[in-house]
Amino acid sequence: MEGNKLEEQDSSPPQSTPGLMKGNKREEQGLGPEPAAPQQPTAEEEALIEFHRSYRELFEFFCNNTTIHGAIRLVCSQHNRMKTAFWAVLWLCTFGMMYWQFGLLFGEYFSYPVSLNINLNSDKLVFPAVTICTLNPYRYPEIKEELEELDRITEQTLFDLYKYSSFTTLVAGSRSRRDLRGTLPHPLQRLRVPPPPHGARRARSVASSLRDNNPQVDWKDWKIGFQLCNQNKSDCFYQTYSSGVDAVREWYRFHYINILSRLPETLPSLEEDTLGNFIFACRFNQVSCNQANYSHFHHPMYGNCYTFNDKNNSNLWMSSMPGINNGLSLMLRAEQNDFIPLLSTVTGARVMVHGQDEPAFMDDGGFNLRPGVETSISMRKETLDRLGGDYGDCTKNGSDVPVENLYPSKYTQQVCIHSCFQESMIKECGCAYIFYPRPQNVEYCDYRKHSSWGYCYYKLQVDFSSDHLGCFTKCRKPCSVTSYQLSAGYSRWPSVTSQEWVFQMLSRQNNYTVNNKRNGVAKVNIFFKELNYKTNSESPSVTMVTLLSNLGSQWSLWFGSSVLSVVEMAELVFDLLVIMFLMLLRRFRSRYWSPGRGGRGAQEVASTLASSPPSHFCPHPMSLSLSQPGPAPSPALTAPPPAYATLGPRPSPGGSAGASSSTCPLGGP
């Protein structure tokens, strides 16, 4: 009976234990002493996810199946170590060169280079705004007495320094010149300075070159300037100039600004001024101008100014034809009656071309017109569109610039710079500079109210020029700019043969007699040279499409592969990480099942089995060996079979006939 049971056990198919790694699957042979039939191999069960059991197997599989050129040579030449080493070094060098090129391409992309695209367009053009000034600072009736007093003090100063006197306003009599000079703060002085450190020969050449303008000053020892101090007189300096002309003009300008600051906001004298006092004739596209085509304002240094075709014009001028006859033509009065000779030393007019929504900065962009000359100014329009963001530091409308726009116009870099200086002036000096707009509730600078504003202003001007105020850094360039490239031509006007009838007609038409014929008039023509205008636009030099194309070209150059090869490389890296993780997991588990802890582990297993209820089935010795850490058992069992007699039923201690127990070995055979 027992023999029959043993034969049934031998004829049962062996159990198999699947492993964790690929290729780790085993088949157990029958344990019977004499198998009745050959053992049939059991089909391996394929797992959903299988991994290679070693790095060597992984690299061999990759090199045999990848589409990357040269990788298969590492496997095909494995029996020749020299070839294997050669191809390995070549493959690694090629791989390194490719990724070096990749680094250059990514570096170029993240530097955000731009390309300049130039397009030539042709269409009807909006005529720009034109501002023209008289170059004649105005003597306001409201401050006439103060200006006359300043003229008398200036003449006395020139007489004391240069022995020069030509004005008819000089006051002689009981009031001495010294008393007259003492009535004005910050007097102009002649200051002794040490000789220059370089040789006397160089000093003599400098002195001789400057002595013509200032005959009373020895330039080895003297300079002209005026003293400025802070509020408590603890710090003072001299604002000096090497030229007496520059010193007198700047000193006069400084006092003139203080007088202008006392004017009220609105002046009736400015409203009474009309265009006919300055412009004899005005035509655009052969049509006469009218009062609705211009606006008037006053500049402290350039006098009365008129802006044609500005944003206040309801119908902006359009140019549909180029040429001198299809633009703006003006006949100007260039005489300077009732002018301020110490403030303005030139005659003629000053003109500037700008956009409709831009203020006219006559100091920055204007140029002068000569009397007795016809000036023809041809224009060519250009637009520039910059890229913002990572590609360039520009602003669209100035809303992201930390400077308040004090001008009633759109954002430009000049508007921002002047507003920034005015903000610094108000913050440091406590008053506003009269040449720039001011915020509400802020007064213009006047040494009667702000005694040290001149000291603060000239110090601030030095910091502004050296960009210590940060205005040039804060004020970014606008992303969209429209400019006009100007070129001027000059001709004598009127000619000798035509000047008689021209002056006669001008005098009768305007009820004005030209005293000095040629020096009293000027003419200017402003027109488009051509209707073709150039558009300069920036575009990214390296886009994402260009970057991917360059990367693909480099990959094909060094490996002759495609984008699927990149996926293969990603799969290789993923498999490497998985194998590394599994090896670390094995090492982590082996720390708790190390040989030094084997006795303790066996005791724990024995106690667990002893405390468990009896079972009718015994685990296979191979499964027990696999459940314990250590080297995997051999697929073929060479040890003798266990004692089968011990597997028979034994009577229970209680003598129960139906109960049976079995004794199972914990280890292998």
Curated annotation (Swiss-Prot):
Ubiquitinated. Can be ubiquitinated at multiple sites and undergo monoubiquitination and polyubiquitination. Ubiquitination by NEDD4 or NEDD4L inhibits the ENaC channel through endocytosis, intracellular retention and degradation of its individual subunits. A motif (PY motif) lies at residues 640-644. Residues 630-643 have a biased composition (Pro residues). Disulfide bonds join 133-305, 229-236, 282-289, 394-479, 416-456, 416-475, 420-471, 429-456, 429-479, 431-445. Changing residue 394 to S: Increased channel activity. Residues 33-42 have a biased composition (Low complexity). GO terms for biological process: cellular response to acidic pH; cellular response to aldosterone; cellular response to vasopressin; intracellular sodium ion homeostasis; multicellular organismal-level water homeostasis; regulation of blood pressure; sensory perception of salty taste; sensory perception of sour taste. It is found in: Apical cell membrane; Cell projection, Cilium; Cytoplasmic granule; Cytoplasm. GO terms for molecular function: ligand-gated sodium channel activity; WW domain binding. Changing residue 493 to R: Results in a 4-fold increase of amiloride-sensitive sodium currents; found in BESC2 patients at higher frequency than in controls; associated with an increased risk for ischemic cerebrovascular events. Originally identified and characterized by its inhibition by the diuretic drug amiloride. Inhibited by phenamil. It comes from the Eukaryota. The record marks 178-179, 204-205 as: Cleavage by Furin. It catalyses: Na(+)(in) = Na(+)(out). The gene is SCNN1A. This is Epithelial sodium channel subunit alpha. The lineage of its organism: Eukaryota, Metazoa, Chordata, Craniata, Vertebrata. Signal peptide: none annotated. NCBIfam families: ENaC (TIGR00859). Belongs to the amiloride-sensitive sodium channel (TC 1.A.6) family. SCNN1A subfamily. Residues 175-243 are annotated as: Gating release of inhibition by proteolysis (GRIP).
